[in-house]
Regions:
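Active-site His/acidic residue clusters
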Residues: 434-435
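Hydrophobic alpha-helical segments with strong N-terminal bias
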Residues: 100, 115, 146, 241, ...
């Protein structure tokens, strides 16, 4: 036999023409070809082998060698319906992972729980790591969590760490589980190719709450008040319309998703992948809409005879949200079906019919009535007279270097530098005629931005002693800085007094947030390590330890130092499949007994400067 050089060339001497040659490579299917001069062999990926490699905290492992509870998921290649966010790809796919949509709004977030919640007061959201960059739990305006900012078509795999023994390597941020996302990359030697995938979908309400029609309600009122002294008033309050208020607020929604990918390799050194994505998700509740634009760039060159592997990842996102007020849904069920959507005499209310009461507060001759606070509000007016929208942008990027030391190839040095930067602004304007308003309307805005940086480095040593003993030892350091800023302003107006004042002074500011915001930051410094020992591919031992130093905890002079927390774990496992009594069994593919213990932490319920005394000015 022989091996190829760096360019894939090989030479075999003293081989008869036509003899069968077997060509193999790790992660590829073995090919059998006939010997001939200048023979060319193309190896295909062996998906079964590739799927056995699982990304864990700070490294990878073969699936059969896992000791903690780790689940790997590759997104379906076939269209399984509307997939707007990465969280849609997780729903119902992994045991112990529950994904619950929060209201079903377009582009809305979801609650993700891994084996339930772990805290009564702090966050129960899992830690999300994208290409080695841990995200924070604070979203941006328009995107409450980090998953909504990722184009699902750019995701190569999910790896979910579920139990304490697997999550302890993430220390004070691992108590709720960890979701590790790896994005797609180019392949070495691949010819340039352009691919497109897109979809257009239609959504509609399946059913509505059964309520009376206008005619049924009129008949009911006539019978209910027949012979009653209030019969005349009750009949006079009825309208002549037949309005289905639920039909008025819902619509058939059309959504579209388009993605273009360019991938290939410059020679055999620089694989690349560039992607463009556009999503337009229209909600079935009128006025709700979500748009997202994404750009992804991945470069992963291999240098120095594959001893240095570099992964450069950059993902940009721009989002647009338009929110519909959910109060319209409740009011659509309760509002009088005999009344029209719009009617004459309601000019102060945008022309929309409302139940009114005399205006004893405002003393404005031009505004003699206000909406009756004891009656339902016009659901169409709620939607049409409120403009609530958000604009967002985000960038997540990382530079990942993995160096296999020359002359000492069992040792690998790994460095990751990454960042997560984003911002957004939400504007909310309520028309003066809106039933949600009080006389002269309101307007406001809230914005925020974040800058999160991370630096992690670790060394990993692999060593096999004979065929029985395998050691894998890793030790590293990580530094993280989280910074964010928020501002907001809100204004609402009301008449100044009982008599109309002079022109230009008709309205008084009664509620004002003057726009003062805040800035906050915290640091996390960590040391971590892991040791795996495998004997005879049947018996496994894993130990991990992480020490986290957080600026959120007390460090003041004279106080007990509470900044550092320590998070160990230990696991022992026995692979029954490797024993003689199961080795040849074709029914059981894998069986392993595992005993594990681990300790994780939680710092999301602690304020950045909670140990300082607060003063109000």
């Amino acid at each position: 036999g022989t091996t190829t050089d760096f360019d894939g060339n090989f030479t075999l001497s003293n081989v008869k023409q036509g003899a069968k040659l077997q060509v193999s490579y790790v992660g590829s299917q073995t090919q059998e070809v006939a010997a001939a001069p200048n023979v060319q062999v193309v190896l295909q990926d062996n998906s079964q082998v590739l799927n056995e490699v699982v990304v864990i905290g700070y490294g990878v492992a073969k699936k059969k060698d896992l000791t903690g509870s780790v689940a790997a998921l590759k997104p379906d290649t076939k269209n399984k319906g509307v997939v707007v966010s990465a969280q849609d790809m997780l729903a119902g796919k992994i045991a112990g992972v529950a994904v619950t949509s929060e209201g079903g709004t377009p582009g809305g977030s979801a609650t993700i729980r891994i084996r339930g919640g772990s805290s009564l007061n702090a966050s129960n959201d899992p830690l999300i790591v994208v290409d080695g960059v841990p995200l924070d739990h604070n979203g941006i305006k328009g995107f409450p969590n980090g998953l909504g900012m990722i184009n699902p078509q750019d995701i190569e795999s999910f790896n979910v760490l579920k139990d304490a023994s697997a999550c302890a390597i993430y220390g004070s941020r691992g108590s709720n589980g960890v979701i590790i996302i790896t994005t797609k990359k180019g392949k070495r030697g691949q010819k340039p190719s352009i691919s497109y995938n897109g979809s257009v979908t239609m959504s509609a309400k399946k059913k509505t709450i059964d309520v009376m029609t206008g005619d049924e309600y009129r008949d009911y009122i006539k019978k209910a008040f027949a012979g009653n002294e209030r019969e005349a008033d009750a009949l006079a309050a009825l309208g002549n319309a037949n309005t289905d208020w639920q039909d008025e607020i819902y619509r058939t929604a059309w959504s579209q998703d388009h993605n273009v990918q360019l991938s290939g390799s410059v020679g055999k050194i620089l694989p690349y992948r560039v992607s463009l994505g556009y999503t337009d998700n229209q909600g079935i509740l009128k006025t709700s809409d979500f748009k997202r634009y994404t750009v992804g760039v991945n470069l992963n060159p291999s240098l120095f005879d594959d001893h240095l592997v570099i992964n450069l990842n950059a993902n940009w996102m721009w989002g647009r949200n338009h929110y519909a007020d959910g109060a319209a849904i409740n009011n659509a069920v309760r509002f009088d079906p005999t009344q029209p959507v719009m009617a004459e005499g309601f000019e102060n209310f945008g022309g929309y019919f409302e139940w009114l009461s005399s205006n004893s507060d405002m003393k404005d001759a031009n505004w003699p009535t206000i909406t009756n606070t004891n009656a339902p509000r016009n659901p169409v007016a709620i939607l049409m007279l409120k403009n609530d929208r958000a604009r967002s942008h985000n960038f997540t990027g990382s530079a990942d270097f993995d160096y296999k030391v020359h002359g000492f190839e069992d040792l690998r040095l790994h460095l990751t530098i990454g960042g997560d930067f984003g911002g957004g602004k939400q504007n909310t304007d309520v028309d003066n005629g809106s039933p949600l308003s009080s006389y002269w309307g309101s307007f406001g805005w809230a914005d925020g931005c974040k800058e999160n940086r991370t630096l992690s480095m670790y060394a990993q040593y692999y060593k096999d002693f004979t065929d029985k003993h395998h050691f894998d030892i890793m030790a590293g350091y990580e530094w993280q800085h989280f910074w964010r800023k928020e501002n907001s302003e809100y204004r609402k107006y009301y008449p100044t007094n009982s008599s109309l004042p002079t022109a230009g002074q008709e309205h008084q500011l009664i509620l004002k947030n003057d726009g003062k915001g805040f800035r906050t930051e915290n640091y996390l410094v960590s040391f971590f390590g892991r040791m795996n020992y495998i004997y005879d591919n049947k018996y496994y031992l894993t130990f991990t330890m992480r020490a986290d130093g957080s600026s959120r905890f007390n460090w003041l002079p004279g106080a007990k130092n509470q900044q550092w927390g320590y998070f160990p774990s230990a696991v022992a496992a026995w692979s029954l499949k490797g024993e003689d009594f199961l080795k040849d069994n074709t029914t059981v593919s894998e069986m392993k007994l595992r005993l594990g213990w681990g300790q994780t932490g939680q710092q999301e319920g602690v304020a950045d400067y909670g140990y300082f005394a607060n003063y109000s000015m």
